[in-house]
C-alpha cells in the first residue's frame, strides 16, 4: 500500500532563473486580499507538479518556449500574480501590482518518464531537482508570487512544477490560471473564463462578529506532552494508495445504519484514526479533524465565475483521543460528517470576522489533522498542447495537512493516494495499523431484534 520516497539518481541542468513579466502593460495599483486569503494558515507556499508525455503532434515545439510565452500572455489578465505582497494595518495583506513578474526556470534532465517510474507520485523524491528553490524567493512578503520550472526529458516529455504563494489563490483558482496558460499556449488570445478579483466578497462584516464555534482556531496551551509539534527535518514521507480492495475492506467495517458516506469521508476518518493510534496520544487529550470545504456554490453562497481567490473553510470536530482510538471506524466517520455539516453562509462570514477580531490566527496545530480532497480540482486536466499529464497533483504534504489525489499505480489500478509525513517510529506504527484496517474484513452483521 505504501510507496516509499526512495532515492532516484539523475542530473538536471538548469538555466539561470528568469523573470517573466506580463506581455503587455498592466494596471499599477494596490489590491487588498480577502479576510479568508490572508490568515496565518494561508501564508505558505504550495507546490504542484505535472508529468507530460511526448506528443508527436507537437514535434518541433519546445515546451519551455511555448509555456514561457503563454505565461507572459496569461499574466496580462492575471496581473496581480506579477506583483508583490505588502502588509498593512492589522496585518492586512495587499498585492502591489508592480508588474515585476514571476520566476521561471528552464531545465533539462538526463532521464525519461519511464525511468522515473514510481517517482511519478506525490512526495516525488526528486522534487528539489524539478523545482529549484531560488534563494530569497520563499518569503511571503516582497517575493515573486509564483515560481515555475519546466524540465525537458530525454524522451521528449517534460515536467511542469510550480510553487504558489497560497494567500493569492486556492487550488481552484490556481487551476483557472493554469488553464489560461494552456489556452494561450494553444493559440487563444482571450481566456475562455475571465478572472475576477472582487476579494471584498469574502471580507469581514462591519462590525465583525463571531457567531459560530470554530474548533479549528482554538488556542491549545495545556497538553499532556503527547501532542508535540513536528520538526519537518526529522520526518519521513510515504504515499499510501487506496484501491478498490482497500476501500471495500474499510466499507465492510461500517454498519448499514451509518447511511451513505463518500469515499473521501471513509479515507479521512481511517487515516485520522490510524494516525492518532500511531502517535500513542494520551486518551484524555483532545484531538481534532479539520475538513477543507470549497465554498463555491455551496449552501447558496455564490461567487462569480472567474473568482480565483481562496474560497474554502476548514470546520473541525473534536473528541478525546481515547474515544477515537477505542471506537470503531464509524465513530470517526460521524465526526467527519459533523465537521462538514458546519458549513453554511453564516459559518463563512463568522470565519472572516474571526480573522479580523483575533488578528488572523494560525489554525490549531496540536492534535489537529487535515485532509483536502483535490480529486476534482483539475490538476490532472491542464493541457499546454501536449495533452493531459500522466500525473498532476500537489507535490508535497505538510506535517498536519495532507491531500487525497486520484492515482493509477504500477499495476494499472486506479484509486486514491494520500501522502503522509510522520516521525519514523510513528510512521511504522501508522503503516501497521493501516494494514490491519484495510485487510479483508468480515461484513458487519447487526441484530434484527
From Swiss-Prot:
It comes from the Eukaryota. Optimum pH is 7.0-9.0. No AMAT activity can be detected in Vitis vinifera grapes. The keyword Acyltransferase applies. The active site is at residues 166, 383. Monomer. GO terms for molecular function: acyltransferase activity. The gene is AMAT. InterPro entries: CAT-like_dom_sf, Plant_acyltransferase. Acyltransferase that catalyzes the formation of methyl anthranilate, a compound implicated in the 'foxy' odor character of Concord grapes. Can use a variety of alcohol substrates when assayed with both benzoyl-CoA and anthraniloyl-CoA. Belongs to the plant acyltransferase family. Its EC number is 2.3.1.232, 2.3.1.196. It catalyses: anthraniloyl-CoA + methanol = O-methyl anthranilate + CoA; benzyl alcohol + benzoyl-CoA = benzyl benzoate + CoA. This is Methanol O-anthraniloyltransferase. Gene3D superfamilies: Chloramphenicol acetyltransferase-like domain. It comes from Vitis labrusca. It holds the Pfam family Transferase. Keywords: Acyltransferase, Transferase. K(+), Ca(2+), Mg(2+) and Mn(2+) increase enzyme activity while Cu(2+) and Zn(2+) inactivate the enzyme. Expressed in berry outer mesocarp, but not in berry skin.
Amino acid at each position: 500500500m505504501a510507496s516509499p520516497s526512495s532515492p532516484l539518481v539523475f542530473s538536471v541542468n538548469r538555466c539561470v532563473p528568469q523573470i517573466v513579466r506580463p506581455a503587455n502593460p498592466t494596471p499599477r495599483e494596490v489590491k487588498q486580499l480577502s479576510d479568508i486569503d490572508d490568515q496565518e494558515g494561508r501564508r505558505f507556499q504550495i507546490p504542484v507538479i505535472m508529468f507530460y508525455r511526448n506528443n508527436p503532434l507537437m514535434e518541433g515545439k519546445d515546451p519551455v518556449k511555448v509555456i514561457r510565452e503563454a505565461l507572459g500572455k496569461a499574466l496580462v489578465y492575471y496581473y496581480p500574480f506579477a506583483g508583490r505582497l505588502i502588509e498593512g494595518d492589522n496585518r492586512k495583506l495587499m498585492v502591489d501590482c508592480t508588474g515585476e513578474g514571476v520566476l521561471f526556470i528552464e531545465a533539462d534532465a538526463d532521464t525519461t518518464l519511464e525511468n522515473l517510474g514510481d517517482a511519478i507520485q506525490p512526495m516525488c523524491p526528486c522534487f528539489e531537482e524539478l523545482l529549484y528553490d531560488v534563494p530569497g524567493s520563499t518569503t511571503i512578503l516582497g517575493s515573486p508570487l509564483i515560481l515555475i520550472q519546466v524540465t525537458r526529458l530525454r524522451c521528449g516529455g517534460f515536467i511542469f512544477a510550480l510553487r504558489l504563494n497560497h494567500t493569492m489563490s486556492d487550488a481552484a483558482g490556481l487551476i483557472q490560471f493554469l488553464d489560461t496558460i494552456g489556452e494561450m499556449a494553444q493559440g487563444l488570445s482571450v481566456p475562455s473564463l475571465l478572472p475576477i478579483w472582487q476579494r471584498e466578497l469574502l471580507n469581514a462584516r462591519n462590525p465583525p462578529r463571531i457567531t459560530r464555534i470554530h474548533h479549528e482556531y482554538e488556542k491549545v496551551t495545556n497538553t499532556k506532552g503527547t501532542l508535540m509539534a513536528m520538526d519537518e527535518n526529522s520526518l519521513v514521507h510515504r504515499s499510501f494508495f487506496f484501491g478498490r480492495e482497500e476501500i471495500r475492506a474499510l466499507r465492510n467495517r461500517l454498519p448499514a445504519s451509518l447511511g451513505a458516506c463518500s469515499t473521501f469521508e471513509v479515507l479521512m476518518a481511517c487515516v485520522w484514526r490510524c494516525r492518532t493510534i500511531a502517535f500513542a496520544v494520551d486518551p484524555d487529550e483532545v484531538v481534532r479533524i479539520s475538513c477543507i470545504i470549497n465554498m463555491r456554490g455551496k449552501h447558496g453562497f455564490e461567487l462569480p465565475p472567474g473568482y480565483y481567490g481562496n474560497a474554502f473553510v476548514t470546520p473541525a470536530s473534536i473528541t478525546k483521543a481515547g474515544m477515537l482510538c477505542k471506537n470503531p471506524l464509524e465513530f470517526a466517520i460521524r465526526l467527519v460528517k459533523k465537521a462538514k455539516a458546519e458549513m453554511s453562509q453564516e459559518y463563512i462570514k463568522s470565519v472572516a470576522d474571526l480573522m479580523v477580531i483575533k488578528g488572523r490566527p494560525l489554525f490549531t496545530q496540536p492534535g489537529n489533522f487535515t485532509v483536502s480532497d483535490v480529486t476534482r480540482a483539475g490538476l490532472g486536466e491542464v493541457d499546454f498542447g501536449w495533452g493531459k499529464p500522466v500525473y498532476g497533483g500537489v507535490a508535497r504534504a505538510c506535517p498536519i495537512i495532507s491531500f487525497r489525489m486520484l492515482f493509477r499505480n504500477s499495476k494499472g489500478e486506479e484509486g486514491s493516494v494520500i501522502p503522509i509525513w510522520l516521525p519514523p517510529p510513528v510512521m511504522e506504527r501508522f503503516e501497521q495499523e493501516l494494514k490491519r484496517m484495510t485487510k479483508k474484513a468480515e461484513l458487519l452483521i447487526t441484530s434484527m431484534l
